[in-house]
Regions:
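Conserved redox-cofactor binding core of oxidoreductases
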Residues: 37-38, 50-52, 83, 88-209
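N-terminal export/assembly segments and adjacent metallocofactor-ligating motifs
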Residues: 36, 64, 70, 76, ...
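Glycine-rich loop(s) and the adjacent beta-strand/alpha-helix scaffold that form part
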Residues: 3-29, 198, 207, 211-214, ...
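FAD cofactor-binding and catalytic pocket of flavoenzymes
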Residues: 53-60, 65-68, 78, 83, ...
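A conserved FAD-binding loop/helix module that cradles the flavin
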Residues: 468-487
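A glycine-rich dinucleotide-binding beta-alpha-beta segment and adjacent secondary-structure elements
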Residues: 152-154, 169-175, 179-183, 205, ...
Protein backbone atom coordinates (compact mmCIF):
# COMPACT_ATOMS: atom_id res chain seq x y z
CA UNK A 1 0.00 0.00 0.00
CA UNK A 2 2.81 2.43 0.78
CA UNK A 3 4.44 1.84 -2.60
CA UNK A 4 1.09 2.38 -4.37
CA UNK A 5 0.18 5.52 -2.44
CA UNK A 6 3.62 6.96 -3.23
CA UNK A 7 2.63 6.52 -6.87
CA UNK A 8 -0.63 8.41 -6.25
CA UNK A 9 -2.93 5.38 -6.16
CA UNK A 10 -5.62 5.34 -3.42
CA UNK A 11 -5.86 2.17 -1.35
CA UNK A 12 -8.14 0.61 1.25
CA UNK A 13 -6.49 -1.83 3.66
CA UNK A 14 -8.75 -4.51 5.13
CA UNK A 15 -7.29 -6.20 8.22
CA UNK A 16 -9.11 -9.11 9.83
CA UNK A 17 -7.71 -8.36 13.28
CA UNK A 18 -7.51 -5.37 15.62
CA UNK A 19 -5.25 -2.35 15.32
CA UNK A 20 -2.74 -3.07 18.05
CA UNK A 21 0.05 -0.55 18.49
CA UNK A 22 3.53 -1.03 19.90
CA UNK A 23 2.30 0.53 23.13
CA UNK A 24 -0.30 -2.24 23.42
CA UNK A 25 2.25 -5.06 23.37
CA UNK A 26 3.17 -6.92 26.52
CA UNK A 27 6.51 -8.51 27.36
CA UNK A 28 4.95 -11.77 28.43
CA UNK A 29 5.09 -14.76 26.10
CA UNK A 30 1.69 -16.33 26.61
CA UNK A 31 -0.22 -13.10 27.19
CA UNK A 32 1.26 -11.67 24.00
CA UNK A 33 0.44 -14.86 22.11
CA UNK A 34 -3.21 -14.54 23.14
CA UNK A 35 -3.17 -10.87 22.16
CA UNK A 36 -1.55 -11.23 18.73
CA UNK A 37 -1.97 -14.73 17.32
CA UNK A 38 -4.49 -15.87 14.71
CA UNK A 39 -6.53 -18.18 16.93
CA UNK A 40 -9.53 -18.73 14.65
CA UNK A 41 -10.27 -22.41 14.23
CA UNK A 42 -8.24 -24.45 11.78
CA UNK A 43 -7.96 -28.14 11.05
CA UNK A 44 -4.94 -30.30 10.30
CA UNK A 45 -4.29 -33.60 8.56
CA UNK A 46 -1.28 -35.54 7.36
CA UNK A 47 1.61 -37.21 9.14
CA UNK A 48 3.55 -34.09 10.17
CA UNK A 49 4.42 -33.78 13.84
CA UNK A 50 2.55 -30.48 14.26
CA UNK A 51 -0.77 -32.21 13.47
CA UNK A 52 -0.15 -34.46 16.48
CA UNK A 53 1.18 -31.85 18.89
CA UNK A 54 -0.93 -28.82 17.89
CA UNK A 55 -3.88 -30.05 15.78
CA UNK A 56 -5.75 -26.74 16.09
CA UNK A 57 -2.69 -24.54 15.59
CA UNK A 58 -0.88 -25.51 12.39
CA UNK A 59 0.61 -22.04 12.04
CA UNK A 60 1.78 -19.31 14.38
CA UNK A 61 0.80 -16.10 12.58
CA UNK A 62 -0.61 -12.77 13.72
CA UNK A 63 -4.17 -11.48 13.37
CA UNK A 64 -3.65 -7.73 13.77
CA UNK A 65 -2.54 -4.72 11.76
CA UNK A 66 0.98 -5.39 10.53
CA UNK A 67 0.38 -9.11 10.37
CA UNK A 68 3.17 -11.53 11.09
CA UNK A 69 5.82 -8.86 10.48
CA UNK A 70 5.03 -7.86 14.07
CA UNK A 71 5.96 -11.36 15.28
CA UNK A 72 8.94 -12.30 13.12
CA UNK A 73 12.45 -12.40 14.58
CA UNK A 74 13.92 -10.26 11.80
CA UNK A 75 16.33 -12.51 9.85
CA UNK A 76 16.85 -11.22 6.28
CA UNK A 77 19.00 -13.54 4.15
CA UNK A 78 18.48 -13.50 0.38
CA UNK A 79 17.61 -16.39 -1.91
CA UNK A 80 20.57 -17.74 -3.89
CA UNK A 81 20.50 -17.88 -7.68
CA UNK A 82 20.02 -21.65 -7.89
CA UNK A 83 17.06 -21.50 -5.49
CA UNK A 84 15.08 -19.70 -8.18
CA UNK A 85 15.89 -22.68 -10.44
CA UNK A 86 15.00 -25.58 -8.16
CA UNK A 87 13.78 -27.99 -10.82
CA UNK A 88 16.73 -27.29 -13.10
CA UNK A 89 19.19 -27.59 -10.19
CA UNK A 90 17.80 -30.54 -8.25
CA UNK A 91 16.16 -32.44 -11.10
CA UNK A 92 12.92 -34.34 -10.74
CA UNK A 93 12.45 -35.85 -7.27
CA UNK A 94 9.87 -38.54 -6.76
CA UNK A 95 6.88 -37.11 -4.93
CA UNK A 96 8.02 -33.49 -5.26
CA UNK A 97 6.34 -30.91 -7.51
CA UNK A 98 9.45 -28.84 -8.12
CA UNK A 99 9.28 -25.96 -10.56
CA UNK A 100 11.61 -23.16 -11.62
CA UNK A 101 10.47 -19.67 -10.67
CA UNK A 102 9.28 -17.46 -13.55
CA UNK A 103 11.77 -14.82 -12.35
CA UNK A 104 15.51 -14.85 -11.62
CA UNK A 105 17.86 -13.55 -8.96
CA UNK A 106 19.17 -11.03 -11.50
CA UNK A 107 15.68 -9.54 -11.77
CA UNK A 108 15.24 -9.58 -8.00
CA UNK A 109 18.55 -8.00 -6.97
CA UNK A 110 17.49 -4.33 -7.29
CA UNK A 111 14.34 -5.10 -5.30
CA UNK A 112 16.35 -6.93 -2.66
CA UNK A 113 18.43 -3.76 -2.35
CA UNK A 114 15.29 -1.65 -1.92
CA UNK A 115 13.84 -4.07 0.62
CA UNK A 116 17.05 -4.25 2.68
CA UNK A 117 17.22 -0.46 2.83
CA UNK A 118 13.56 -0.21 3.84
CA UNK A 119 13.99 -2.85 6.55
CA UNK A 120 17.39 -1.58 7.67
CA UNK A 121 19.02 -5.00 7.40
CA UNK A 122 22.20 -5.19 9.47
CA UNK A 123 25.44 -6.05 7.64
CA UNK A 124 23.93 -4.51 4.47
CA UNK A 125 24.32 -1.07 2.85
CA UNK A 126 26.50 0.20 5.69
CA UNK A 127 24.16 -0.86 8.48
CA UNK A 128 26.17 -1.99 11.54
CA UNK A 129 25.74 -5.44 13.12
CA UNK A 130 23.85 -6.16 16.28
CA UNK A 131 26.00 -6.94 19.34
CA UNK A 132 26.80 -10.56 20.09
CA UNK A 133 24.83 -11.94 23.02
CA UNK A 134 25.80 -15.03 25.01
CA UNK A 135 23.62 -17.35 22.94
CA UNK A 136 25.49 -16.20 19.84
CA UNK A 137 28.91 -16.45 21.51
CA UNK A 138 28.30 -20.12 22.35
CA UNK A 139 26.95 -20.66 18.83
CA UNK A 140 29.96 -18.97 17.20
CA UNK A 141 32.41 -20.82 19.44
CA UNK A 142 30.98 -24.14 18.34
CA UNK A 143 30.92 -23.00 14.71
CA UNK A 144 34.61 -22.15 14.82
CA UNK A 145 35.51 -25.44 16.48
CA UNK A 146 33.72 -27.57 13.87
CA UNK A 147 35.23 -25.59 11.00
CA UNK A 148 32.36 -23.41 9.82
CA UNK A 149 33.41 -20.18 8.11
CA UNK A 150 30.22 -18.23 7.36
CA UNK A 151 28.59 -17.07 10.58
CA UNK A 152 27.67 -13.63 11.90
CA UNK A 153 25.15 -11.69 13.98
CA UNK A 154 22.87 -11.15 11.01
CA UNK A 155 21.59 -9.87 8.68
CA UNK A 156 18.60 -8.81 10.78
CA UNK A 157 15.99 -6.06 10.39
CA UNK A 158 16.47 -4.82 13.95
CA UNK A 159 18.43 -1.63 14.45
CA UNK A 160 21.82 -1.67 16.13
CA UNK A 161 21.70 2.14 16.00
CA UNK A 162 18.88 4.59 15.19
CA UNK A 163 17.78 4.35 11.56
CA UNK A 164 14.85 5.55 9.47
CA UNK A 165 12.95 6.93 12.45
CA UNK A 166 13.35 3.76 14.52
CA UNK A 167 15.53 3.61 17.64
CA UNK A 168 18.34 1.20 18.40
CA UNK A 169 17.38 -2.09 20.01
CA UNK A 170 17.44 -2.20 23.80
CA UNK A 171 18.09 -5.96 23.57
CA UNK A 172 15.05 -6.87 25.65
CA UNK A 173 14.45 -10.25 24.01
CA UNK A 174 10.79 -9.74 23.06
CA UNK A 175 10.91 -9.51 19.26
CA UNK A 176 8.37 -12.32 18.98
CA UNK A 177 5.97 -10.29 21.12
CA UNK A 178 5.77 -7.29 18.79
CA UNK A 179 8.76 -5.26 19.99
CA UNK A 180 7.46 -2.38 22.11
CA UNK A 181 10.53 -0.28 21.29
CA UNK A 182 9.96 -0.15 17.49
CA UNK A 183 13.59 -1.01 16.74
CA UNK A 184 12.48 -4.02 14.67
CA UNK A 185 11.01 -3.32 11.25
CA UNK A 186 7.38 -4.20 10.63
CA UNK A 187 4.71 -2.86 8.31
CA UNK A 188 2.93 -1.63 11.45
CA UNK A 189 5.91 0.59 12.27
CA UNK A 190 6.93 1.75 8.80
CA UNK A 191 4.79 1.15 5.70
CA UNK A 192 1.24 1.41 7.03
CA UNK A 193 1.68 4.73 8.91
CA UNK A 194 3.50 6.22 5.93
CA UNK A 195 0.80 5.08 3.53
CA UNK A 196 -1.86 6.67 5.77
CA UNK A 197 0.16 9.90 5.98
CA UNK A 198 -0.12 10.31 2.19
CA UNK A 199 -3.87 10.81 2.62
CA UNK A 200 -4.50 8.10 0.02
CA UNK A 201 -4.76 5.07 2.31
CA UNK A 202 -7.67 4.11 4.54
CA UNK A 203 -7.09 1.38 7.13
CA UNK A 204 -10.05 -0.67 8.32
CA UNK A 205 -9.19 -3.02 11.17
CA UNK A 206 -11.52 -5.81 12.35
CA UNK A 207 -12.59 -6.29 8.73
CA UNK A 208 -12.54 -9.98 7.82
CA UNK A 209 -12.60 -10.60 4.05
CA UNK A 210 -14.94 -13.46 3.15
CA UNK A 211 -15.31 -13.26 -0.63
CA UNK A 212 -13.83 -11.62 -3.70
CA UNK A 213 -16.49 -10.96 -6.31
CA UNK A 214 -16.09 -10.47 -10.05
CA UNK A 215 -17.98 -9.00 -12.98
CA UNK A 216 -19.35 -10.80 -16.02
CA UNK A 217 -15.97 -10.65 -17.75
CA UNK A 218 -14.23 -12.39 -14.86
CA UNK A 219 -12.42 -9.34 -13.49
CA UNK A 220 -12.40 -8.86 -9.71
CA UNK A 221 -14.68 -5.96 -8.80
CA UNK A 222 -15.08 -5.97 -5.00
CA UNK A 223 -14.27 -7.57 -1.67
CA UNK A 224 -17.01 -8.58 0.76
CA UNK A 225 -15.99 -8.38 4.40
CA UNK A 226 -17.47 -8.72 7.87
CA UNK A 227 -16.91 -6.15 10.59
CA UNK A 228 -16.45 -7.00 14.27
CA UNK A 229 -20.22 -7.26 14.77
CA UNK A 230 -20.69 -9.53 11.79
CA UNK A 231 -22.18 -6.92 9.46
CA UNK A 232 -21.44 -7.55 5.79
CA UNK A 233 -19.83 -4.76 3.73
CA UNK A 234 -18.75 -4.42 0.11
CA UNK A 235 -15.63 -2.56 -0.98
CA UNK A 236 -15.41 -1.96 -4.72
CA UNK A 237 -11.96 -2.12 -6.28
CA UNK A 238 -10.14 -1.73 -9.58
CA UNK A 239 -7.40 -4.04 -8.30
CA UNK A 240 -7.50 -6.57 -5.46
CA UNK A 241 -4.30 -7.61 -3.66
CA UNK A 242 -4.57 -10.55 -1.26
CA UNK A 243 -2.05 -10.84 1.59
CA UNK A 244 -3.61 -13.17 4.14
CA UNK A 245 -0.66 -15.55 4.54
CA UNK A 246 -0.40 -18.92 2.80
CA UNK A 247 -3.35 -20.43 4.66
CA UNK A 248 -5.97 -17.68 4.59
CA UNK A 249 -5.18 -16.45 1.07
CA UNK A 250 -6.05 -19.74 -0.67
CA UNK A 251 -8.97 -20.16 1.71
CA UNK A 252 -10.36 -16.81 0.54
CA UNK A 253 -10.04 -17.80 -3.12
CA UNK A 254 -11.77 -21.11 -2.44
CA UNK A 255 -14.55 -19.29 -0.57
CA UNK A 256 -14.92 -17.03 -3.63
CA UNK A 257 -16.12 -19.82 -5.93
CA UNK A 258 -18.82 -18.81 -8.42
CA UNK A 259 -20.56 -20.19 -11.49
CA UNK A 260 -17.67 -18.85 -13.59
CA UNK A 261 -15.07 -20.22 -11.16
CA UNK A 262 -16.79 -23.30 -9.65
CA UNK A 263 -13.61 -24.67 -8.03
CA UNK A 264 -12.56 -21.38 -6.51
CA UNK A 265 -11.53 -18.01 -7.86
CA UNK A 266 -8.50 -18.20 -10.20
CA UNK A 267 -8.44 -21.99 -9.90
CA UNK A 268 -8.73 -23.27 -13.47
CA UNK A 269 -5.45 -25.13 -12.92
CA UNK A 270 -6.70 -26.83 -9.75
CA UNK A 271 -3.55 -25.52 -8.05
CA UNK A 272 -5.16 -23.16 -5.51
CA UNK A 273 -4.03 -24.37 -2.09
CA UNK A 274 -1.53 -26.89 -3.49
CA UNK A 275 2.23 -27.00 -2.87
CA UNK A 276 1.96 -25.53 0.63
CA UNK A 277 5.39 -25.28 2.22
CA UNK A 278 6.42 -24.39 5.76
CA UNK A 279 10.21 -24.85 5.62
CA UNK A 280 12.17 -27.75 7.01
CA UNK A 281 12.51 -26.88 10.70
CA UNK A 282 13.59 -28.23 14.05
CA UNK A 283 15.46 -26.86 17.06
CA UNK A 284 18.41 -27.92 19.15
CA UNK A 285 18.84 -27.00 22.80
CA UNK A 286 22.07 -27.70 24.65
CA UNK A 287 22.94 -27.68 28.35
CA UNK A 288 26.25 -26.38 29.66
CA UNK A 289 27.98 -26.49 33.02
CA UNK A 290 27.98 -22.70 33.33
CA UNK A 291 25.22 -20.11 32.75
CA UNK A 292 24.45 -18.96 29.20
CA UNK A 293 21.38 -16.78 29.79
CA UNK A 294 20.27 -17.22 26.17
CA UNK A 295 17.23 -15.01 26.78
CA UNK A 296 19.35 -11.89 27.18
CA UNK A 297 19.49 -9.90 23.97
CA UNK A 298 17.62 -10.51 20.74
CA UNK A 299 15.45 -13.60 20.34
CA UNK A 300 17.49 -14.47 17.26
CA UNK A 301 21.04 -13.14 17.25
CA UNK A 302 23.10 -15.06 14.71
CA UNK A 303 23.16 -17.15 11.54
CA UNK A 304 25.43 -19.90 10.21
CA UNK A 305 25.29 -20.22 6.41
CA UNK A 306 27.82 -23.01 5.79
CA UNK A 307 25.14 -25.69 5.33
CA UNK A 308 22.99 -23.54 3.04
CA UNK A 309 24.60 -24.37 -0.34
CA UNK A 310 23.19 -27.24 -2.38
CA UNK A 311 25.42 -30.30 -1.88
CA UNK A 312 23.65 -33.57 -2.73
CA UNK A 313 26.54 -35.64 -1.34
CA UNK A 314 24.97 -35.03 2.09
CA UNK A 315 22.02 -37.21 1.07
CA UNK A 316 19.50 -34.49 0.20
CA UNK A 317 19.00 -31.57 -2.17
CA UNK A 318 18.87 -27.96 -1.06
CA UNK A 319 20.30 -26.62 2.15
CA UNK A 320 19.55 -25.06 5.52
CA UNK A 321 20.61 -22.32 7.91
CA UNK A 322 21.35 -22.55 11.62
CA UNK A 323 20.01 -19.55 13.57
CA UNK A 324 20.23 -18.81 17.27
CA UNK A 325 16.89 -18.99 19.06
CA UNK A 326 15.99 -18.17 22.64
CA UNK A 327 12.59 -19.01 24.09
CA UNK A 328 11.52 -17.90 27.54
CA UNK A 329 10.91 -20.57 30.18
CA UNK A 330 7.14 -20.74 29.63
CA UNK A 331 7.46 -21.18 25.85
CA UNK A 332 10.35 -23.61 26.21
CA UNK A 333 8.27 -25.74 28.58
CA UNK A 334 5.50 -25.92 25.98
CA UNK A 335 7.55 -26.44 22.84
CA UNK A 336 10.84 -28.15 23.74
CA UNK A 337 9.09 -31.55 23.68
CA UNK A 338 5.30 -31.18 23.47
CA UNK A 339 3.51 -33.44 25.92
CA UNK A 340 6.68 -34.35 27.80
CA UNK A 341 6.89 -34.76 31.56
CA UNK A 342 9.02 -36.62 34.06
CA UNK A 343 12.70 -36.62 34.92
CA UNK A 344 14.15 -35.83 31.49
CA UNK A 345 11.77 -32.91 31.03
CA UNK A 346 12.44 -31.42 34.46
CA UNK A 347 16.18 -31.79 33.88
CA UNK A 348 15.86 -29.66 30.74
CA UNK A 349 13.81 -27.02 32.50
CA UNK A 350 16.00 -26.95 35.61
CA UNK A 351 18.95 -26.21 33.33
CA UNK A 352 17.25 -23.22 31.67
CA UNK A 353 19.85 -20.66 32.74
CA UNK A 354 22.61 -22.89 31.36
CA UNK A 355 20.87 -23.57 28.04
CA UNK A 356 21.75 -22.39 24.52
CA UNK A 357 19.42 -22.81 21.56
CA UNK A 358 19.27 -22.74 17.79
CA UNK A 359 16.65 -23.15 15.09
CA UNK A 360 17.22 -25.13 11.92
CA UNK A 361 15.49 -23.71 8.84
CA UNK A 362 15.86 -25.26 5.40
CA UNK A 363 14.17 -25.82 2.08
CA UNK A 364 11.28 -28.27 2.16
CA UNK A 365 10.04 -29.88 -1.02
CA UNK A 366 6.76 -28.71 -2.56
CA UNK A 367 4.21 -31.50 -2.93
CA UNK A 368 0.84 -31.26 -4.62
CA UNK A 369 -0.72 -33.18 -1.73
CA UNK A 370 0.54 -30.66 0.83
CA UNK A 371 -2.35 -28.31 0.48
CA UNK A 372 -4.90 -25.96 1.97
CA UNK A 373 -8.53 -27.00 1.52
CA UNK A 374 -11.87 -26.04 3.05
CA UNK A 375 -12.82 -28.24 5.97
CA UNK A 376 -15.85 -30.47 5.48
CA UNK A 377 -16.71 -30.46 9.18
CA UNK A 378 -15.40 -27.33 10.93
CA UNK A 379 -16.68 -23.77 10.56
CA UNK A 380 -15.58 -20.44 11.97
CA UNK A 381 -17.72 -18.12 14.07
CA UNK A 382 -19.22 -16.69 10.88
CA UNK A 383 -20.33 -20.13 9.73
CA UNK A 384 -17.71 -20.40 6.99
CA UNK A 385 -15.54 -23.51 6.47
CA UNK A 386 -12.17 -23.19 8.17
CA UNK A 387 -8.94 -24.02 6.39
CA UNK A 388 -7.60 -27.55 6.65
CA UNK A 389 -3.82 -27.77 6.44
CA UNK A 390 -2.58 -31.11 5.12
CA UNK A 391 1.16 -31.74 5.26
CA UNK A 392 3.54 -34.68 5.06
CA UNK A 393 7.32 -34.48 5.16
CA UNK A 394 9.00 -35.46 1.91
CA UNK A 395 11.80 -38.03 2.18
CA UNK A 396 14.24 -35.21 1.36
CA UNK A 397 12.93 -33.22 4.32
CA UNK A 398 13.45 -36.16 6.69
CA UNK A 399 17.02 -36.67 5.49
CA UNK A 400 17.84 -32.97 5.83
CA UNK A 401 16.40 -32.70 9.33
CA UNK A 402 18.28 -35.78 10.57
CA UNK A 403 21.55 -34.49 9.12
CA UNK A 404 20.96 -31.01 10.54
CA UNK A 405 20.25 -32.35 14.03
CA UNK A 406 23.52 -34.28 13.93
CA UNK A 407 25.47 -31.20 12.85
CA UNK A 408 23.80 -29.04 15.50
CA UNK A 409 24.66 -31.57 18.21
CA UNK A 410 28.26 -31.71 17.00
CA UNK A 411 28.50 -27.92 17.14
CA UNK A 412 27.25 -27.67 20.71
CA UNK A 413 29.33 -30.61 21.92
CA UNK A 414 32.40 -28.96 20.40
CA UNK A 415 31.54 -25.90 22.51
CA UNK A 416 31.35 -28.03 25.66
CA UNK A 417 27.69 -29.03 25.94
CA UNK A 418 26.92 -31.69 28.54
CA UNK A 419 23.56 -32.58 27.00
CA UNK A 420 21.43 -31.82 23.94
CA UNK A 421 17.79 -32.19 22.93
CA UNK A 422 16.25 -32.43 19.46
CA UNK A 423 13.07 -30.33 19.52
CA UNK A 424 10.44 -31.08 16.85
CA UNK A 425 9.00 -28.38 14.55
CA UNK A 426 6.87 -25.64 16.06
CA UNK A 427 3.59 -24.44 14.51
CA UNK A 428 4.55 -22.93 11.17
CA UNK A 429 5.78 -19.36 10.97
CA UNK A 430 7.18 -19.60 7.42
CA UNK A 431 4.01 -20.34 5.46
CA UNK A 432 4.81 -20.49 1.75
CA UNK A 433 3.44 -21.63 -1.59
CA UNK A 434 -0.25 -22.60 -1.97
CA UNK A 435 -0.78 -20.00 -4.75
CA UNK A 436 2.51 -20.36 -6.52
CA UNK A 437 3.87 -18.36 -9.43
CA UNK A 438 4.45 -20.30 -12.64
CA UNK A 439 5.44 -19.61 -16.22
CA UNK A 440 2.59 -21.77 -17.52
CA UNK A 441 -0.98 -21.37 -16.18
CA UNK A 442 -1.39 -25.14 -15.81
CA UNK A 443 1.46 -25.31 -13.27
CA UNK A 444 0.35 -22.67 -10.80
CA UNK A 445 -2.03 -19.86 -9.92
CA UNK A 446 -0.04 -16.66 -10.52
CA UNK A 447 2.20 -15.20 -13.19
CA UNK A 448 5.63 -13.62 -12.70
CA UNK A 449 4.06 -10.47 -11.19
CA UNK A 450 1.98 -12.36 -8.64
CA UNK A 451 -1.13 -11.73 -10.76
CA UNK A 452 -3.64 -14.54 -11.20
CA UNK A 453 -3.40 -16.31 -14.55
CA UNK A 454 -7.22 -16.37 -14.66
CA UNK A 455 -8.08 -12.89 -13.29
CA UNK A 456 -6.04 -10.01 -14.70
CA UNK A 457 -6.60 -7.61 -11.78
CA UNK A 458 -6.23 -10.06 -8.88
CA UNK A 459 -2.82 -10.10 -7.19
CA UNK A 460 -1.34 -12.01 -4.27
CA UNK A 461 1.25 -10.19 -2.17
CA UNK A 462 2.36 -12.68 0.50
CA UNK A 463 4.42 -15.87 0.80
CA UNK A 464 1.75 -17.83 -1.07
CA UNK A 465 3.38 -16.70 -4.32
CA UNK A 466 6.60 -18.61 -3.73
CA UNK A 467 7.23 -21.26 -6.36
CA UNK A 468 9.68 -23.06 -4.08
CA UNK A 469 10.76 -22.17 -0.57
CA UNK A 470 14.54 -21.85 -0.65
CA UNK A 471 16.36 -22.00 2.67
CA UNK A 472 16.24 -18.30 3.54
CA UNK A 473 13.78 -16.80 6.00
CA UNK A 474 11.13 -15.51 3.59
CA UNK A 475 10.21 -12.00 4.75
CA UNK A 476 12.89 -10.13 2.80
CA UNK A 477 11.90 -11.93 -0.40
CA UNK A 478 8.19 -11.27 0.25
CA UNK A 479 8.90 -7.55 0.72
CA UNK A 480 11.09 -7.40 -2.39
CA UNK A 481 8.39 -9.13 -4.44
CA UNK A 482 5.74 -6.75 -3.06
CA UNK A 483 7.78 -3.67 -4.02
CA UNK A 484 8.27 -5.10 -7.51
CA UNK A 485 4.58 -5.96 -7.78
CA UNK A 486 3.45 -2.50 -6.67
CA UNK A 487 5.67 -0.94 -9.32
CA UNK A 488 4.04 -3.16 -11.96
CA UNK A 489 0.51 -2.39 -10.73
CA UNK A 490 1.16 1.37 -10.77
CA UNK A 491 2.55 1.25 -14.31
CA UNK A 492 -0.33 -0.94 -15.50
CA UNK A 493 -2.99 1.30 -13.96
CA UNK A 494 -1.41 4.42 -15.43
CA UNK A 495 -1.31 2.71 -18.83
CA UNK A 496 -4.96 1.67 -18.56
CA UNK A 497 -4.09 -2.03 -18.63
CA UNK A 498 -5.90 -2.94 -15.40
Amino acid sequence: AYELTKAGIPCVLLEAGPHLTNEDYVNDEWEAFGQMAWLDGRATSGSWRVAKDFPDLPAWIVKAVGGTTTHWAGATPRFKDYEFKALSTYGKLEGASLLDWPISLEEMEPYYDKAEKALGSTHRHGRPPLPANNNYKVFANGAERVGYKFYATGPYATNAEPYDGRPASVQDGFNFQGDKQKSKWSTLVREIPRAIETGLCELRADSHAVQITHDSSGKADAVLYLDAEGNLHRQAAKVVCVAGNSIESPRLLLLSASSMFPDGLANSSGEVGCNYMRHLTGSMYARFEKPVHMYRGETMAGIIADEQPHNPSRGFVGGYYMETLALGPSFLASFVEPGAWGEDFTEMMDAYANTAGMWIVGEDMPQTSNRITLSDSSKDKWGLPVANVNYDDHANDVSMRTYAYEKAEALYKAAGAIGTHRTPPYPSTHNLGSLRMSELPKDGVLNRWGCAHDVKNLFVSDGSVMTTGGAANPTLTIVALAIRQAEYIAKSLNAGDL
